[in-house]
Amino acid sequence: MAKQKFERTKPHINVGTIGHVDHGKTTLTAAITKVLSLKGAAQFMAYDQIDNAPEERARGITIAIRHVEYQTDKRHYAHVDCPGHADYIKNMITGAAQMDGAILVVSAPDGPMPQTREHILLARQVQVPAIVVFLNKVDMMDDPELLELVELELRELLSKYGFPGDEIPIVRGSARNALESPSKDINAPEYKCILELMNAVDEYIPTPQRAVDQPFLMPIEDVFGIKGRGTVVTGRIERGKVKVGDTVEIVGMTNDAPRRTVVTGVEMFQKTLDEGIAGDNVGCLLRGIERTDVERGQVLCAPGSIKPHKKFEAQVYVLKKEEGGRHTPFFSGYRPQFYIRTTDVTGAIGLPAGMEMVMPGDNVVMTIELIVPVAIEEGLRFAIREGGRTVGAGVVTKILD
């Protein structure tokens, strides 16, 4: 089969399945590809293909993760499914596969379980914008009143963790019946729940603002002085766009207020550009800035769009020994390096009240105080390193200064 061209005609959305082990996340993922393949909008992927997920590395951490893609009439989706519970935690904290929305799979006979709660909490912490629920295995429930109770419990749980529990769509069905049905007719009754779910995902999960439409930000990777022209900073534009004549700020790595300057040139591969946009690797020539005024680890950004901070709260996953992490626990006051965007900054860790220590393999909320302010915002991912090796991964959940 010839490779199909990637059509940019539809908005592109990243989703993923979350929920307790054995509640049917992978079965549902396979069922979605099967049902949508009946109208040529996906390639069917069997359960085993999805379950046997390849490993990826993100921020120094190995994660098993399976990507599938499919389309609805309205959108193009990239969907992630992880085989193990630890893989989910690692994926959500490192943002290896970004989620614009999540499909929470709950087995109706079991109701919400510990990992259901943990995944909802994590989704809130890492700011997954929206959740749609698939209430699975309803064919195993005879009592409609029990189903109502499970739904009620789920809505309360979602509200407790800061999601709009009363509004969230809950679709009932059986992923296995859809997956195992021999029917080639997309209107077969077993497929109705999958189409209903995709409709809910289409309608309820908002289209994210594209990176290029957000305020300009570029982490500085390198600084050069060019004789007779001034100082050039290079990096990959994280969001927004930049063109000659734009006023920008240099933020972080100093206790002084951010410096303002004007971009007098934008280059890519030694060629001048009209404008650099999100995803481009560029060099920006800055007016009136000395080579010694800028350093790696700072960011170049739209004025006022991001502030430097020292103190924040973060959700952190600490690597196990087998993953190349620490062999021993650490305590409050532990001072590793925090790799934020392009550089390491030393900081001290504070543990929550009543928590003595953190063991390798733990997933915890902690406060972090850096020795210098850095451009930070909620949702920013970082790695924790010790002697150059990654010992943890985190995401900023709250700014504290």
Curated annotation (Swiss-Prot):
Role: GTP hydrolase that promotes the GTP-dependent binding of aminoacyl-tRNA to the A-site of ribosomes during protein biosynthesis.
Name of the protein: Elongation factor Tu
Source organism of the structure: Chloroflexus aurantiacus (strain ATCC 29366 / DSM 635 / J-10-fl)
Record has Magnesium as a keyword: yes
E.C. code: 3.6.5.3
Reactions catalysed according to its record: GTP + H2O = GDP + phosphate + H(+)
Positions of the UniProt region annotated as G4: 136-139
Quaternary organization: Monomer.
Record-linked PROSITE patterns: G_TR_1, G_TR_2
GO (cellular component) term, any one: cytoplasm
Subcellular location: Cytoplasm
Location of region: G3: 81-84
Binding site for GTP: 19-26, 81-85, 136-139
Binding site for Mg(2+): 26
Pfam families from the UniProt entry: GTP_EFTU, GTP_EFTU_D2, GTP_EFTU_D3
Entry's family note: Belongs to the TRAFAC class translation factor GTPase superfamily. Classic translation factor GTPase family. EF-Tu/EF-1A subfamily.
Residue ranges annotated for the tr-type G domain, each copy included: 10-209
Keyword set, alphabetical order: Cytoplasm, Elongation factor, GTP-binding, Hydrolase, Magnesium, Metal-binding, Nucleotide-binding, Protein biosynthesis
A single BP term in Gene Ontology: translational elongation
HAMAP family in the cross-refs: EF_Tu_B (MF_00118_B)
Residue segments, region G5: 174-176
Region G2, annotated ranges: 60-64
GO molecular function, one term: translation elongation factor activity
Top enzyme category: hydrolase
